[in-house]
């Protein structure tokens, strides 16, 4: 264990003691130490050396547990100062020693010198000189060593050092306390402030015996958050070390044994104190983990005051390098590519309360389970009626609340997914159903761990694992802390209150119940709903929160391709583009909040009507994307014109259901058009906005007072409860409130989100548009939504005129209209419908003059010649006005009739 050296001398002289070297591991008393060699492939051998020719006081000793009559032995005077003198001088230092005597029992006595040779400080002489030990009596006085010891002792006596000082030395006797009556109170009384201590014994790498100063409490301290391999006690009393137990113990011993440290007392467990040992050279807890000598333990990691993440990171460091206890470690995601371990995806569906379906950038769908959490579940076998089919979402307490929390937070949003582990498929057993392979991950949005948020609200619980089970969340400690908070605050599943009950009536396919509900739903107008399931492009299952019922809903006004169906004895194939239509509807509305208008029901008890998502009609959207055709029943609907316009646009693209469309000659429709008569029914309107393409927005004068009242009430409400700046996250198509340049709030709709600083909004009651930062936007209060008062600005275009395509000419026309009619009251008559918006004639309220005709007279626009019979009188008047403008060479006509030769060049069409 220790190197040796022979002192020089004649071959015939007396034998010179061999000089040996070692590192001082421990000081047993004022006259005995343990030295060790250098480690080579494992803990080194050890050896006890007793100092020759001197005697120091005996240290205190606790009575043996097996001897009930025995009593604790206290320190002898000056015994502890002698031990401390050697401890501070020798621990961890290299010494050399010579063995002078060895007893039959194996005890070795000799001289110890500090340093690499015998020229160093003689430890025995130093002890005697300090008055901490006495020279043994009866030794030969002519011995040179004895003579030096005698001189040292005389000097100590003369200087009254140590035991030669006045008094009996009782002040050097420690009042040792071996037990603590109330460990919890003892720990709390220190308020996690560092306590000075000496490590007296190392049981294993993570458990030590410490002497707390200055009150001399001798306590067992377990390192918080970790566990090292231990020594298993066998039946015969021997100890068998687990792999790396001896190495871990030596690692701690060589750094802490009999060192001055500070300990943060953090908690207690079975009379043992949990703590963190601080040493100037580092934190032993983290070092043990980093070197692969320890593993994290869940039951105590939460009390580690320096943050559980530091311990997990240190453990991860050792795992990645397969150090020591992790030599056979295989990472849970070792077989995954980096792009599959971490990715961004869009949430398309929430499955109950612990899983989501996401859409990857590749367009593929993937089910992700939230790592290490368990959704709410039924407790006990008798809680469910055997004859009643279980509906987990509504029948399991807090399942609905958990699903709703995830749905509102995640649906349609992009999230960050970090895969923690892959749970392999498992076969079914008598008690457990079969499970397919599961991808378990940590999902975050805006830096928030969704699983942690769910647990903190008491809407899920944390799964407990075996200590060696590494398949768990990478943020497992945060989950445990969140659960502890939820339990403490009595949240959700941990609440002492009665569990919430959701009595949801499922009237899907129940004709009798559907008939009873129909009048209520028809009278309700637009009702709020959540899309629970999408059967096909036009068939959905809805949850109506106000009515607390589930209904099957069919989209009105369209004919959507039918999907494949299982019929008795055969499978009916789906129509072309049925799957595309279903996917389109799923991506757009599944688990979204929508508005529905119920118009009727079919024989099977399914409701028929219109569904709106973010202000858009789903029937129109399906037609627009060539995934449905307009059904003849839509003619009676207010959305018929929008459907026709969408269908016409889809036909022109010749895609999907219109891929083989052949356009019919227009002439065939003309006789039908000629049968109509022009109706002139002018109504008063207020013009609020003129667009650059000469469209304009108006408000109905009859509902103007309603708008004024709503705006007044809304602004009062906002003044009382102002929106928190920056709290609103705008989404395209969403209604909101926006602060205009005048500092007032108005209703608006988000048209585009470029960035938080650039949000395009449309003021729905006035028709103007603006680009604003999101800090000037807020949530539209439900009391002032479009259900209470529809958007008041309606878009129109001038009938019978053709707007110049030349930018300067068009600007002249727009400027003229702005001067004449913006922010004034006019009279409006709808002449004909067209794609985009209705075309109208507009009259000045006072003179009844035709605004469009005035533009023609001034040569600012051209006439759009229409062939319908009912318009011929008006067209003639417009053409005569155009001829007058041409003759006078006004504006467009200043260079004559340019249309014959230069129409294409100047951007006009005749």
UniProtKB/Swiss-Prot annotation:
InterPro entries for the chain: Silence_cplx_Nase-comp_TudorSN, SNase_OB-fold_sf, Staphylococal_nuclease_OB-fold, Thermonucl_AS, Tudor, Tudor_TDRD11
Enzyme Commission number: 3.1.31.1
CDD domains xref list: SNc (cd00175), Tudor_TDRD11 (cd20433)
One MF annotation (Gene Ontology) recorded for this entry: RNA binding
Cross-link Glycyl lysine isopeptide (Lys-Gly) (interchain with G-Cter in SUMO2), where in sequence: 513
Motif (Nuclear localization signal): 321-325, 388-392
Pfam family, one: SNase
N6-acetyllysine: residues carrying this PTM: 193, 641
Residues bearing PTM N-acetylalanine: 2
Compartment annotation: Cytoplasm; Nucleus; Melanosome
Keyword Ribosomal protein found: no
Swiss-Prot/TrEMBL keywords: Acetylation, Cytoplasm, Endonuclease, Hydrolase, Isopeptide bond, Nuclease, Nucleus, Phosphoprotein, Repeat, Transcription, Transcription regulation, Ubl conjugation
Modified residues (Phosphoserine): 426, 645, 785, 909
PTM (free text): Phosphorylated by PIM1 in vitro.
GO CC annotation: cytosol; dense body; melanosome; nucleus; RNAi effector complex
GO terms, biological process: miRNA catabolic process; mRNA catabolic process; regulation of cell cycle process; regulatory ncRNA-mediated gene silencing
Reaction(s) catalysed by this chain's protein: Endonucleolytic cleavage to nucleoside 3'-phosphates and 3'-phosphooligonucleotide end-products
Main location: cytoplasm
Residue ranges occupied by any TNase-like domain in the UniProt entry: 18-166, 193-328, 341-496, 525-660
Keyword Transcription assigned: yes
List of residues that carry Phosphothreonine: 103, 240, 779
Self-association and partners: Forms a ternary complex with STAT6 and POLR2A. Associates with the RNA-induced silencing complex (RISC). Interacts with the RISC components AGO2, FMR1 and TNRC6A. Interacts with GTF2E1 and GTF2E2. Interacts with PIM1. Interacts with STAT5. Interacts with SYT11 (via C2 2 domain); the interaction with SYT11 is direct.
Protein's name according to its UniProt entry: Staphylococcal nuclease domain-containing protein 1
